[in-house]
Amino acid sequence: MGSIRGNIEEPISQSLTRQNSLYSLKLHEVQTHLGSSGKPLGSMNLDELLKTVLPPAEEGLVRQGSLTLPRDLSKKTVDEVWRDIQQDKNGNGTSTTTTHKQPTLGEITLEDLLLRAGVVTETVVPQENVVNIASNGQWVEYHHQPQQQQGFMTYPVCEMQDMVMMGGLSDTPQAPGRKRVAGEIVEKTVERRQKRMIKNRESAARSRARKQAYTHELEIKVSRLEEENEKLRRLKEVEKILPSEPPPDPKWKLRRTNSASL
């Protein structure tokens, strides 16, 4: 049955939504209203069944291809589809000898048959209380009570998070005080961020100024040292060029004399 559920188009679900009351009828009730002159439902294929039970307005959709079925499924009779459903149920491990009575083909509704066959992927919610059924060119009104369906609505995780952030799952609007407080928090956050950015820029500017002053001071010292080095080099060259003069004689000289007689 996995292949039967594969290639079903959305127009089928939309059509069943419009004619949901009709699909709530049991198959033996549909056969009764169709009359004895009609073809038995068990020998009809699904394509014939849909064309038979649908009103003329919906038959136009069938002819136009809006209500298309997979070819392998549309050619199967109702009995064959029901047999496949029972085999699939037994193959999945469902016991046939249970305390609950298993429904027969005539006891299930047309909607249940299409659901189990995989034609419809979601349950159709009844919208009307009166159904007009085409039978040998005549319309028979069938009244039934709407079936109330209860269940939990599922939400994606991202939508749940968005709804929680917006203040809950209810549609009640937030109080003006909450909006004002939230706006003030946002404004304070933006103001703090701007002040932090200004401080960072000022600190970076002061750091660049200190680096530039230190570099300028080093450049001045280097230039002074280079000038002194150049002066010393020139003085040394001048000393090499000038001739060397002998040292001057002393003013008083020592002389050797004889003071004793021999």
From Swiss-Prot:
Disruption phenotype: No visible changes in phenotype. The modification Phosphothreonine is found at T104. It is found in: Nucleus. Keywords: Abscisic acid signaling pathway, Activator, DNA-binding, Nucleus, Phosphoprotein, Transcription, Transcription regulation. Pfam families: bZIP_1 (PF00170). GO terms for cellular component: nucleus. GO terms for biological process: abscisic acid-activated signaling pathway; regulation of abscisic acid biosynthetic process; response to water deprivation; stomatal closure. Residues 190-253 form the bZIP domain. The keyword Hydrolase does not apply. The keyword DNA-binding applies. It comes from the Eukaryota. Residues 239-252 have a biased composition (Basic and acidic residues). Binds to the embryo specification element and the ABA-responsive element (ABRE) of the Dc3 gene promoter and to the ABRE of the Em1 gene promoter. Could participate in abscisic acid-regulated gene expression during seed development. DNA-binding heterodimer with ABI5/DPBF1, DPBF2 or AREB3/DPBF3. Interacts with the AFP proteins AFP2, AFP3 and AFP4. This is ABSCISIC ACID-INSENSITIVE 5-like protein 3. It comes from Arabidopsis thaliana. The lineage of its organism: Eukaryota, Viridiplantae, Streptophyta, Embryophyta, Tracheophyta.
